[in-house]
Amino acid sequence: MATLSQPQSALPKTKIATTFGLSKDLKSPISVKVCYLECTRNNVSLVPLSTKFEDPTVFKKLSQIYKNSDLFVEIRVYDGKNNNLISTPVRTSYKAFNNKGRTWNQQLKLNIDYNQISIDAYLKFSICEIIDTKPSVFGVSYLSLFSHDSSTLRSGSHKIPVFMEDDPQYSKNIQYGTLIGLTDLEKRLIDYENGKYPRLNWLDKMVLPKVDATFLKTNNKDHDYYLYIELPQFEFPIVYSDIIYQIPTIEPITETTSKIPPDDTLNSNIIINSIDIPMATSHDPSIMKVYDPDFHITANNHLNPNATTFDPVELKYRKLERNIDNNTILDKELKPTPQLRDELLRIMIKPSNAESTDNEKNLIWKFRYYFSKNNSGNDPSNKSVKSFLPKFLRSINWENDYELDHTFKEIIPFYWNVDKLQIGDALELLGDYFNPYTLGKPTYQDDSMTSKSSKMKSDEKRFIKIYNNVCFLRKLAVERLKLANSEELLLYLLQLVQALKYEALIYEKSPPFCERSDQIEDNASSTLKSPLADFLIERAVENEKLGNFFYWYVKVENEDQLNNPHIDGPIKIYMDILNRYIELLKAHCHENRLPYYKHLKHQIWFIKKLTSLVELLRASFKKNEATAKKVEYLREYLANSGNELLKFPEPFPLPLDPSVMICGCYPEESSVFKSSLAPLKITLKTIEKKKHGHATSQLFGKRSRYGKYPLMFKIGDDLRQDQLVIQIIDLMDQLLKNENLDLKLTPYKILATSPISGLIQFVPNETLDSILSKTYPTSVTYSGGGETSDGPPSVSNNGILNYLRLHSQEQQSEEPISKSILSTNTSQSNTEIPVLPRQPKPTITSDLGVSPILMDNYVKSCAGYCVITYILGVGDRHLDNLLLSPNGKFWHADFGYILGRDPKPFPPLMKLPIQVIDGMGGLHHENYNVFKSYCFITYTTLRKNSNLILNLFQLMLDANIPDIQFDPSRVIEKVQEKFCLQMTEEEAILHFQNLINDSVNAFLPVVIDRLHSLAQYWRA
């Protein structure tokens, strides 16, 4: 903020003080409120009725049919000088329009601050609609952020014209001065809305209707559409200002030394080229200079502004500290003291994206033999070597030939093989850090003080070494993945598909030299020949279940890259991989007479049929029409055998769950959800697998038994974030089962079939809101022995408790023991999964009138989801997305907000309503103590596997997932904070105990739940 004083006139000496702010000091993200879209034409030309019947394809573009069809606005910030995109786009959420017009009234915030933009920056508003499940531009608008007339930031309401074609030529007509097109009446109305005129209620009631009528008569019709937006208003006008950096000047090095006269009387030392040499007297003819090969590197860094500056003393210390010839023999026998061991353990638990200090790197280097000799990737109790290899590889200097040769010729070959590498470390080696173009980046700076030919030769030799070593590490990681069985590999497949982006950056990119070196293997020419791509395609072709999910994961990423060309990275990698997979799958199935390729074609046909069905429903019915009519239409459509959905031409595996074969659907059990997107609930007809030993099939021929599989198909939402959360929950469930801890979780299945559509498994459930509001018969209400008889009314009459009592008779037998699909020993990874010992009998008490089996399911699942949702930072928790199944299993749904994001103010760290505790008997019941014990065991178990979970999130940083892209730099940090890795196990348990107490006793979440229930009631 600045204050400028000016004389008002020449005669009087009074001054006017003007206060304003500077844009360089405004560290606030750019925000825009999208208000509404105005149509200046009275009669919008729509497609006539005859054309609708002649050409059904016109229904794809709803703006040709409905005057107020669905649209959304996408905002980008561009640099006006070069028209370069300088921010990631943000878009409005779905909004149901009425007959009055298209109104959003949504506030959008971009990921760029005001102090980061130039005076020529402008906003581009892309108004889009969905055509064939893909965004299509309806019109574009432009607005400059600064006015060049006054060099001030624009604020308040603005009316901007809409161009009906996305032509880059329109960006040349951006108005940087006073905006053209606003009438005097519109300017005054905007000034009135911005608060420049006082508001008088009695006068406004009389004048505003007449102003609106006059406004309609004098409406500007230069354009068919105008977009109204609002920019934030600040207390002071914001004047553009930029920071001017001074170019530092460095005096020649020789001048500083020549000014120091030699002292003949002192036997002193001087430093020549960073080496301490005894100084002889000036009369001594034996004076000599010693050449230091590192001196020209540090000196050239001062002359090259693009080079990274290093302290020459630190560089020399590092070289002497890691002199291979001097300390290799001593380092082999080094063992850390207890204090150093604790320090090293603290370094090991740091997340992979955390940069280690020089002292920490030197410690890792010093005790490299100690960790390498005692490594055992399959020993979970050996914490000291956990994640050592990636930490060690991050601590070496990749530009130092000695350290590289020592690492890849002695340490890794003799001490680290595939069996000793953990799966989490293998995933880390496939990340973006191990890239030769970034590890060797400082090497390729221009150096004017050395010979070009010698420098190119040295750089080429060094790059080839780095490149081959990185390729070796990635091959080592892939070899470790080959030891995993297909079920375990499926747990990491989503991240491995993302890792293909990093493979493409290495294998598709040409080296920084013109000619290809013979020392670089030929697999550098194509992503398809990368070890990871080759391995995934090979396993996907051989295993139908793995291939099913591999196809859909790659297909969605391919469509996302094609629809978002601004995303960095090679755009054809997923297209090439997809085509290669289909080609090899077709050949493999033809050679071995397998139905995998035919099943894949049927799955694609099935998804296209569902997509066309949703589009037909949306085109046939208005949004506000009764859901019953849509349901009736859906059932008639499904029952029509001509549509081929009642009975499929051939059975095929369900894309959502390939272990289920589907052959048709049940129309009467299908429905349409009451939602603006009109998602479908389809109950599919499944073919159940026959059990061995049935003689009837041999005597009377084949007789299939049929089952039911309800699912939801949704268009309009990106399900990849929910898909990621469910995958992490499924992984955590397997990690817990690997420790013989089955918490009865319900990781229902989700599969994104495109960036805006997908399938969701429909699990029978009821929301806690409906359970708590129901009235149960007196026969269910229990007041027998135990704590409930004389406990508080909130416990004895708890709706959850009554719900469990009501369903206690339905499940009297225990569920079979669920085994983990994770390999406890790599030698058994491709064989049968080891059988876990039988779990002990549940310690759940049955004095509440509930079956011990249901209460066991309820308490365990509550504990599991309590810990998991806390670690993942799941937000927007209310009683409508906390669910309970008839088998007593408690679970969460709708993961639209994760990593600490929440639309409500002051969200709790953990969602644990008191009603959930009352459902297990209350705070003073023994079941509550059992619940807390399960929470503590779950939390400590997942903390031990934090490295694997963090590495999975590390591979997802470049995925187009909303809550990850919101702040990708802090994703790993947010998850790591929840693990509290800096605490001991006892401290972590105490921390979680405090979290439970705070959540149970919290008052604000109870109020918000009541308000949410009230809002849902009035909305219904």
UniProtKB/Swiss-Prot annotation:
It comes from the Eukaryota. GO terms for molecular function: 1-phosphatidylinositol-3-kinase activity; ATP binding; protein kinase activity. Residues 666-1004 form the PI3K/PI4K catalytic domain. One of its GO terms (biological process) is positive regulation of transcription elongation by RNA polymerase II. Its main location: Golgi. Residues 331-577 form the PIK helical domain. Its EC number is 2.7.1.137. Residues 49-210 form the C2 PI3K-type domain. Residues 873-881 are annotated as: Catalytic loop. It catalyses: a 1,2-diacyl-sn-glycero-3-phospho-(1D-myo-inositol) + ATP = a 1,2-diacyl-sn-glycero-3-phospho-(1D-myo-inositol-3-phosphate) + ADP + H(+). InterPro entries: ARM-type_fold, C2_domain_sf, Kinase-like_dom_sf, PI3/4_kinase_cat_dom, PI3/4_kinase_cat_sf, PI3/4_kinase_CS, PI3K-type_C2_dom, PI3K_accessory_dom. Keywords: ATP-binding, Endosome, Golgi apparatus, Kinase, Membrane, Nucleotide-binding, Transferase. Component of the autophagy-specific VPS34 PI3-kinase complex I composed of at least VPS15, VPS30, VPS34, and of the VPS34 PI3-kinase complex II composed of VPS15, VPS30, VPS34 and VPS38. Interacts with VMNA7. Belongs to the PI3/PI4-kinase family. This is Phosphatidylinositol 3-kinase VPS34. It comes from Candida albicans. The lineage of its organism: Eukaryota, Fungi, Dikarya, Ascomycota, Saccharomycotina.
